[in-house]
Swiss-Prot record:
Binding site for substrate: Y113
Organism placement in taxonomy: Bacteria, Pseudomonadati, Pseudomonadota, Alphaproteobacteria, Hyphomicrobiales
E.C. code: 5.4.99.12
Protein name: tRNA pseudouridine synthase A
Gene: truA
Assembly with partners or alone: Homodimer.
Catalytic activity of the protein: uridine(38/39/40) in tRNA = pseudouridine(38/39/40) in tRNA
Family membership noted in the UniProt record: Belongs to the tRNA pseudouridine synthase TruA family.
Function field: Formation of pseudouridine at positions 38, 39 and 40 in the anticodon stem and loop of transfer RNAs.
HAMAP family, per the entry: TruA (MF_00171)
Short name of any one Pfam family annotated for the protein: PseudoU_synth_1
Stretches assigned to coiled coil: none
UniProt keyword annotation of Isomerase present: yes
GO molecular function, one term: RNA binding
Keyword annotations from UniProtKB, A to Z: Isomerase, tRNA processing
Length: 247
């Protein structure tokens, strides 16, 4: 039974998240329905990351097993045709046959995320579902300085959801950079894995630094508190993009 790796792009605005759920449409469910329409097979696909409602992806990775072999470009194009027919905001960017031991989630060695903030007085029209609108000037250099306190191996209890199901709050952040281009501020994060709501918690707290409400050292103090109450407000989902997975 051949195994295929799919690289997936999606607009998460109208989905309950990546994972199949009973309370609304999911990205996983949309792809599984497309596979069923194409092949007649009921499959369960596994993604590299379980993005929340409203979170987007430009490089989510998933795998699935099919009973017959497919030319990979045919599989990609056929799935995209079925997704388009169902008016899904999901696109298969690439399909590749992989060894049976490949696992989209557990074989990953690094995940890359981007959080976008647009800092300007005027509300967003075109970018309203793809960035966090902050109607004031932010000091991105102070935000970047603060972010470096979060790089490395730490207990991130402060920056994970109270509903996080991970066994341990310990994670290693390889990269957390804040840059600015005009009115766009980008927060780029890299790690092998992240905790639930971790990046959005980072972004919300870094915004406080950018506003001057916190100093960079205040972020370090929040980290060391190991207390969810020490976290700033969680940033909204629309600014978060799952960019890439390394294997």
């Amino acid at each position: 039974m051949p195994r295929y790796r799919l690289t997936v792009e999606y607009d998460g605005s109208d989905y309950v998240g990546w994972q199949r759920q009973e309370n609304g449409p999911s990205v996983q469910g949309a792809i599984e329905k497309a596979v069923l329409s194409l092949t007649g097979e009921t499959v369960s696909i596994r993604g590299a990351g379980r993005t929340d409602s409203g979170v987007h992806a430009m490089g989510q990775v998933a795998h699935l097993d099919l009973t017959r072999e497919w030319k990979t470009h045919t599989l990609r194009n056929a799935l995209n045709a079925h997704l388009a027919l169902a008016a899904e905001r999901v696109s298969i960017l690439d399909a590749a046959e992989v060894p049976p031991e490949f696992d989209a989630r557990f074989s990953a060695i690094r995940r890359h995320y981007l959080y976008r903030i647009i800092s300007r007085r005027s509300p967003l029209a075109l970018e309203a579902r793809r960035a966090w609108w902050v109607p004031k000037t932010l000091d991105h250099e102070a935000m970047h300085e603060a972010a470096q306190h979060l790089v490395g191996h730490h207990d991130f209890t402060t920056f994970r959801s109270a509903h996080c199901q991970a066994n341990s709050p310990l994670r290693t952040i390889d990269r957390l950079d804040v840059t600015r281009s005009g009115e766009l501020i980008e927060i780029r994060a890299t790690a092998q894995s992240f905790l639930h709501n971790q990046i959005r918690s980072f972004a919300g707290s870094l915004k406080l630094v950018g506003e001057g409400k916190w100093t960079p050292d205040d972020l370090k103090t929040a980290l060391e508190a190991r207390d969810r109450k020490a976290c700033g407000p969680v940033a909204p989902p629309e600014g978060l993009f799952f960019m890439q997975v390394d294997y």
